[in-house]
């Protein structure tokens, strides 16, 4: 479709976008029909290049700092205009999409991309509505210009690339970045800012529902098991990464999944395996000479990805919504090998561990990560994406848990028997058995043992799980060394938590250093 000097393709189909991507040399077809694209040096998010425009309407609500870096409004206007001018003679792809599968809490967004495969990604991950913007809300704009090169001296950026959110003007600018995950996380950050004002808790979590309508949430950083554990053949998927919890129910913020592919196997992750087909975008996945994806190959990055629409999953909740959750699971990947595979939390402990967000960066999704696996505290299990102060989200979580009576569990998908490099990681079947026990209600009123240093209640038995694994000290050959590591972890929790202004009940719910 002609539009001035350039050609603009409005709401193109999957087949058209795959065809354009191949013709333009943006990617290649794999043997399973997916489109594989490479992102170059930036194979993960670039947190140091992410900004929020500091303007009067939102300034007082945002927790400014290294995560939410301020950007000058005038500099934003200039850069937005330069990017628009740069794209004026380019072939472009445009779609009208939505973020939020809820009739009240959705945001309409027009996505303009320079690359066909980026548009395919957006149409896979955002929601393609039957009727666009039925409540006639103001429309957000995303512009993604990966070949535009930023000049820090001219543009006010930190490097040759940037991601900037402007809440007042409802604009998201992505320039100089090929990693498509920046698009989805930008709109997640937008909803993370907007939803709390509407009494809705935005969550970095996956969600599924059983045949009886019981909803389970899985919070966790990338690589801790959100996508894998929510893709359960016995349950129906709501979504794998971003949700809102409103009074009365849970809804997916997205319309697709962005699954990690490293070491993907049909045996361990059949739902994800089967979803990778024509229409799926594979990011930085290496193929063999017959175009068969080699999911074990991390030569480009550990952070290999598959982006596919929820329609690629047979067992899904078609309206992308569910009831309020009976069970809430905090997934932590403990590299110290100290935490038990499952703990049952009080609501005060839930608030403590939600604010702490203790876990590991596993095959980090951020560029510049020097170690494949390192421990971290990530507030709300997603610190890079939450613009408001952490307490806002923690208070909303407590409110939702109390009003509905949800039970919260801490599940360790990391190491046992010793730290990373000495112990071994819990295998997926063990964690699945624990999750099965959680969703069935088996762990609601069971006998527990209290781990004093960690201040956690651990069940003495879980169906399908070796009882020796449940109390972590049993898996360490050197019990004194375990006690030493447990004390170190408790001290790390206490030190990290000192920054939070909370009630004594919440502060005392943490480990005892």
UniProtKB/Swiss-Prot annotation:
Enzyme nomenclature, EC number: 4.1.1.49
One GO BP annotation of this record: gluconeogenesis
Keyword Plastid: no
Enzyme class: lyase
Cellular location(s): Cytoplasm
Primary residence: cytoplasm
Co-factor note (free text): Binds 1 Mn(2+) ion per subunit.
Keywords recorded for this protein, A-Z: ATP-binding, Cytoplasm, Decarboxylase, Gluconeogenesis, Lyase, Manganese, Metal-binding, Nucleotide-binding
Gene Ontology MF terms in the entry: ATP binding; metal ion binding; phosphoenolpyruvate carboxykinase (ATP) activity
Residue numbers binding Mn(2+): 185, 204, 241
Cofactor(s) the protein needs: Mn(2+)
Record field: catalytic activity: oxaloacetate + ATP = phosphoenolpyruvate + ADP + CO2
Residues that, per the record, bind ATP: 185, 204, 220-228, 269, 305, 431
Highest taxon in the source lineage: Bacteria
Binding site for substrate: 45, 179, 185, 305
InterPro entries: PEP_carboxykinase_ATP (IPR001272), PEP_carboxykinase_C (IPR013035), PEP_carboxykinase_N (IPR008210), PEPCK_ATP_CS (IPR015994)
Pfam families named among the record's database cross-references: PEPCK_ATP
Task of the protein: Involved in the gluconeogenesis. Catalyzes the conversion of oxaloacetate (OAA) to phosphoenolpyruvate (PEP) through direct phosphoryl transfer between the nucleoside triphosphate and OAA.
Family: Belongs to the phosphoenolpyruvate carboxykinase (ATP) family.
Subunit structure: Monomer.
Protein name, entry field: Phosphoenolpyruvate carboxykinase (ATP)
Phylogenetic classification of the source organism: Bacteria, Pseudomonadati, Pseudomonadota, Gammaproteobacteria, Alteromonadales
Encoding gene (name): pckA
């Amino acid at each position: 479709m002609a539009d001035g000097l350039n050609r603009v393709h409005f709401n193109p189909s999957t087949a058209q976008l795959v065809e354009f991507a191949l013709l333009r040399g943006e990617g290649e077809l794999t043997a399973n029909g997916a489109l594989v694209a490479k992102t170059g040096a930036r194979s993960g998010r670039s947190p140091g290049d992410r900004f929020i425009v500091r303007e009067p309407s939102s300034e007082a609500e945002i927790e400014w700092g290294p995560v939410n870096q301020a950007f000058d409004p005038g500099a934003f206007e200039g850069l937005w205009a330069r990017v628009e001018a740069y794209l004026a003679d380019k072939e472009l792809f445009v779609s009208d999409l939505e973020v939020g599968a809820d009739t009240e809490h959705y945001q309409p967004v027009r996505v303009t991309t320079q690359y066909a495969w980026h548009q395919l990604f957006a149409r896979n991950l955002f929601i393609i509505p039957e009727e666009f913007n039925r409540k006639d809300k103001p429309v957000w704009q995303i512009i993604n210009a990966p070949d535009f090169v930023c000049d820090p001296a001219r543009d006010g950026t930190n490097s040759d690339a940037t991601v900037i959110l402007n809440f007042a003007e409802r604009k998201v600018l992505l320039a100089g970045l090929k990693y498509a995950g920046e698009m989805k996380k930008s709109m997640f950050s937008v909803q993370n800012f907007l939803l709390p004002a509407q009494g809705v808790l935005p969550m970095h979590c996956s969600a599924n529902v059983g045949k009886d309508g019981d909803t389970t949430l899985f919070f966790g950083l990338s690589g801790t098991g959100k996508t894998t554990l929510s893709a359960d053949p016995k349950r129906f998927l709501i979504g794998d990464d971003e949700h809102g919890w409103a009074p009365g129910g849970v809804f997916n913020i997205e319309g697709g999944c962005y699954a990690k592919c490293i070491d993907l196997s049909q045996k361990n992750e059949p739902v994800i395996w089967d979803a990778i087909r024509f229409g799926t975008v594979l990011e930085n996945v290496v193929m063999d000479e017959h175009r068969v994806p080699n999911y074990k190959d991390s030569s480009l990055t550990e952070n290999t990805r598959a982006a596919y629409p929820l329609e690629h999953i047979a067992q899904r909740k078609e309206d992308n919504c569910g009831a309020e959750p009976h069970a809430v699971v905090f997934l932590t990947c403990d590299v110290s090998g100290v935490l038990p595979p499952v703990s049952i939390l009080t609501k005060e402990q839930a608030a403590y561990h939600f604010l702490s967000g203790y876990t590991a960066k596993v095959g980090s999704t951020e560029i510049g990560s020097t170690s494949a696996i390192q421990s971290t505290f990530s507030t709300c299990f997603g610190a890079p994406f939450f613009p408001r102060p952490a307490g806002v989200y923690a208070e909303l979580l407590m409110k939702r848990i109390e009003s509905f009576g949800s039970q919260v569990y801490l599940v360790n998908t990391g190491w046992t028997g010793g730290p990373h490099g000495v112990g071994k990681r819990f295998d997926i079947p063990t964690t699945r058995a624990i999750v099965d026990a959680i969703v069935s209600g088996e762990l609601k009123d069971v006998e527990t043992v209290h781990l004093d240093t960690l201040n956690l209640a651990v069940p003495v038995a879980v169906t399908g799980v070796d009882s020796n694994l449940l109390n972590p000290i049993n898996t360490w050959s050197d019990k004194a060394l375990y006690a030493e590591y447990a004390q170190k972890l408790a001290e790390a929790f206490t030190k990290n938590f000192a920054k939070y202004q909370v009630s004594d009940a919440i502060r005392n719910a943490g480990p005892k250093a």
